Structures are given as structure tokens and as C-alpha cells.
Amino acid sequence: MKSTDRANAEIQDRLTRTTPPMDVAIAEKLLLEVKEVMDRLGVQFFLRQGTCLGAIRDNAFIPWDDDLDLGVILGVNGFAEQSIEPLLGAFRESGYYVRSGSSDSLIYATLLKDNIRVDMLFHRVIDKQIYHWPGIWFPVTLFNQLKEINFIGETFLVPNPPEEYLRIKYGPDWRTPKRFGYAKDVVDNVPAEHISGFLERTKRSIAGFFYPGNVTRLKVLDNDGSPVDRANIRIVGLGSFKTNKQGYAKLYLKTKGYSSSIASGISDEVGDICSIVVSYGNHEEVLYEEILTPNRSYVYQPDPAQTEGRIFVLSKLDLP
């Protein structure tokens, strides 16, 4: 890796883990620059997630937003998977550092310029749906006829109707600005995973026996550092798991037909970014972004000084 690429990768990783608010003036300049490149190459894209939320609700960037969120539907207007690399090459020529990868449901590219991240997803249509992290499947009808809006003095496209898109993503209270509490709204709005029956438990046992490399272990500790028995660990979009008396839960991350999360893009980590809800007794915490790697062990412990808004807090646990 070139020294400049290594430096950019480190900046991108730091911004991903610490999520500082964007400089709004720079974000506006880059969004217009991205639009110019996409329009020049004839690529139809739309504003998604936080960028769409700010544009529709506030007609402005959300003050604490940390990146630009854009989407492209593969197969629209002749844009296919083989068109992605030439597009990313155009961004490299425009001075962007680009990192890309894929999951079952999408191809992603994270662009970096002037300390601003642009999170660009190229969505595959699967069973007339497209996937949004964490575990949300949208009907493709929301993207068949994108809606034009005026934002920062230009015309942009958003899902249509945008209100329905935002309701599915953020819940019925999407019009209320929330810096931290929105994460619980999002995960609560993801349909519950039907995985508690005997058949599913049997599938997990078989999967763990034949594919032990896919099993991840998570140990849950309470405030005093003691293991928690029967804590519930929900991997949003995938399933729920219980800890044993030693505080450990076995997580089977690859039991569904579609990937439930997207590859991390963190340069020193190979794994999936997941949303996790840890609950026991009167305690519940949403960890909106965590990296889980198959065949690794992690430990969770609450922080009484910060009860919401934590990300990337799971510690790796080295077992004998």
C-alpha cells in the first residue's frame, strides 16, 4: 500500500470509529462534486439514510451527521456491476481515496476526500427488495420512480415517497431530531427474527458442528465485571442468542440466505458490521455499529457513564 493510501486508510478508519460531525460547508461542496461526476457518467443515484433524512425533514444536513449516504440500484438505466469500477476510477481521478467490497445484497464503496466520508452503496434487487443496513429490506417500488427534490441549490433524487422510506428506516418518530436515541428507533423498527423454535436451534447446532469456523463467541459482563447468565444478545436482522452461566453466547453469523450486514471497510479488521442489542434484567444497550468476525471471541461490558450512543466497543477476547 502506498504511504498516501495508508494515511488515507487510517483517516477513514478513524472517522468511521469516532464519527465526528462533518464540516457542513465541505460536505455541501463534495456532494455537488459527486453529483457532477455521477451526472457526467449518466449514473442515477439517490440520497439515502441520514442524508435523505436531513434533506426531507430539515432541508439541511443533520448537524451531527458524519458522512454522506448515497445509493444506486443496479440494473437501472443500463448501470450494471461492471460499470462500478470505471465510476470509482473517475472518483480516484478527482482526488478521492476509494475502498470497496461486497456482500450478498450489495456492493459498497467508501470514498474519502477533505476528511469527509461518502458511503456509496450499489444495491442488488433480491426478491423485489433492496437491503439497507441493519437488517432492513425495502420494497423496490420505492426506487422505481425516484422523486426530485431541491437541496443545497440543486436537484437530487430520493426514494418515492420519501416519507415512507424514512418511516421504514427510522420508525414513526422520524420527524423528531435525535442524536443518539434514533439507533433504538431503527433497531426496534426491524422486524423480529423468527429464530427461537426447536428447528432453528437444531440448524444452529448442526451449523456449529460442521462449520465451527463460523461460530463467534460473545461474553457479557455486568457493571461489576461478573458474567451474566441468560443475557439476550440480538444481532439485528439475524437472530437472538442467550448467554450461559459463564456469560458466553455462541453466535452463528452465517445461517441465512442473505448477508445480514456489510463487510466492514475497517482496514485492520475483517468481518461484518452489525447492530447488536444486549439486554438482561433492567439493562438494555444498543450497540449500533460493531464488528464481528467468525471464529473470534469478544467481551461486552456496560459503561455507566455512557448508556447510549456507543459504537465499536466490543473487546477481543483471547482464549487459551
Listing of model-derived features with the role each one plays in the protein:
Residues 141, 145-146, 151, 155, ...:
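A conserved mid-domain beta-alpha-beta active-site/ligand-binding segment of alpha/beta enzyme cores
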Residues 207-225:
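A short, Gly/Thr-enriched small/hydrophobic beta-strand-prone motif that recurs across taxa
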Residues 77-85:
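Short, conserved charged micro-motifs
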Residues 302-320:
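Compositionally biased low-complexity segments at domain edges in trafficked proteins
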Residues 215, 224-237:
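Short, ordered, surface-exposed loop/turn motifs in non-cytosolic proteins
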Residues 35-68, 73-77:
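Active-site nucleotide-donor binding segment shared across nucleotidyl transfer reactions
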Residues 16-39, 87-134, 147-156, 180, ...:
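Conserved catalytic core of two-metal-ion nucleotidyltransferases
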Residues 238-258:
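Short, acidic Ser/Thr/Gly-rich low-complexity loop/linker segments typical of extracellular
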